[in-house]
Every structure is written in structure tokens, then in C-alpha cells.
Amino acid sequence: MANRPNGAVRRRAGPFLALLAGAFAAVAPATIDAAPRIVSLDQCADQYVLALAPRDEIAFVSKRALNADSNQRSRAVGLPEHRATLETVLGARASIAVRYWTPDARLPDALRRQGVEVVQLDEANDFAGIRANVRKVAAVLDERATGEALIDKMDAKLAASRGAWGGARALYLTPGGFTAGRDTLVAAMMGAAGLVTAAAGVGYRPVSLEQLVLDPPSALVLGFFRDLAGGRQRWTIGGNSYLRGLAARRTLVSLPGSQLGCPAWYAADGVLAMARAGQVR
């Protein structure tokens, strides 16, 4: 028993050990049970965080959370906004970061090395992909019921829209002169309303004015025209008399960026808008 401290040492150490134990008792539960601090690193991540996370757990949103094309912008009012950097995320003491795309591709790994859990949203070209994204984020945030409620609302709108256009063909068109072929979320949205994209090929691609003049589409679905009018586009309908006439005669619906900009559950709002246009034609 030579290594056992004598009574005097134990008596002197007693108050210190009691104080230390009390400190751990006070701090440990707060550390273990503390609510997560959640940040969103870009505008698409904003939508998921704002819809799924409790407001008091959101440390900050992106600098684009209040933009006109941010679907959940009303929920972002009053929340801190920051550009996504290693310094801002660590400075916010974030425990969870949600990301779709950021200019710095190294940021997710840098955050993980610092102990931040990074939830990466996947590119979703259909509604199954959107369901998977909602469930992924909801699971990490421990908000599964909220996530399922979003999915249920989305699916109800899709069910109400099904087959509205009966297979009619339409060309999707943006102010920058792009259209959507197969394997795009826009094509999936059109298909959910009973439309077939008139664009050949796969993915998003430019369409020329000459093509529109020589082979005019029987119907148009416009996207982003409410949000992106102005000089940033290569061409616009407003700047061309032929296109103005074509749009006036053949536009089925004009969808805002707040329904198109991110692969999220509210894409079903755009589907429903297309379907309703078909129901009143």
C-alpha cells in the first residue's frame, strides 16, 4: 500500500476533487445535450435548413437566403447571413453544415477535419432524388417527421397534377436562351404535369434564335423570366419582336426562379402551375 496517499493528502485534495466533480457535473450535460448549431453554405442548402431546422438552432444562412429567387426567404428574415468560409463556420461554432454547392470545393473536407458534420445535397434530376435529399437532411437534423410532411405535401401536388396535359409537347426556355432535355429536373417537372419536353438530347443546352424561327415550338414553358430580366442574359424575349409574338401566342406558363433554382420539394409548385394551365385551356 506504499502508493496510497496518506490521510493528510486525502484531506487536502478532498475539497479540490469535490469542486472538480461539481464542475464536470455542471458542464457535461450541457456539452452532451446541447442543441446542434446548424449553418447552410449556399442558397439551395438554405431552403432545406430553413424548412427543416428549428429556428433557434440555425447559426447562419447564406448571403443569398433573402434573394427574390429564394423560396424560403420569409423564414430567413432576421437570421445572420454569412459567406461560407472555414472561418465563418468555425466562428459560428457550427456542428452541422448543409451544402449543395460552394465555390471552394475543399471546404467540406476542411470542415470535417475540424469536427463539423457536413450534409451534402445530391444533384436531383427527378422527384425521387428530391425525396432522398429531404430525408437525408431531416435525418441528420433529427426532424424526420417534418421531412415526411414536406414530402407528403409535394406528393399530393404531384398526384393532383398527373396527366393534365395528356402528353403534349412544349419547349422550356430561359432568358439566357437555354432549354431542358431529358434527365433534368425541369423535364421531370413537365412530365409530372403530362408534358413532354420538345428539346432533343440530354441535359440543359442552348437553343438558337434561328432554331426557334425555323422550327417554332407548339408550346412554351418559360423559366426565370420574372427574376432575371435585364442585361445579364444573352438574349431575351422582350428584346426580339418575333419572340415576343411567339411567347404571347404559345406560352403555357412562366415559372419563377423560386420554383426552379434548386432541386427541392417546392418544384411541385411549378408542376401544379403547369397542370392548372392545362386544366383551364
List the predicted regions and their residue ranges:
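N-terminal secretory signal peptides that target proteins for export/translocation
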Residues: M1-R11
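Alpha-helical, coiled-coil/dimerization segments enriched in small aliphatic residues
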Residues: K63-N67, R75-G78, A180-R205
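Extracytoplasmic ligand-binding site segments that recognize negatively charged/polar headgroups
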Residues: R106, D122-K136, R169-L185, L228-G231
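Basic- and aromatic-lined ligand-binding clefts that recognize polyanionic substrates
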Residues: P36-V49, R144-L195
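Bacterial N-terminal signal peptides
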Residues: P15-A28
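A short, structured surface patch at a secondary-structure boundary
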Residues: P36-T102, G201, N240
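Structured C-terminal subdomain patch of bacterial secreted/periplasmic proteins
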Residues: P36-R37, A128-A139, E148, W165, ...
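Short secondary-structure boundary segments
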Residues: D42, W101, V202, G223-D227, ...
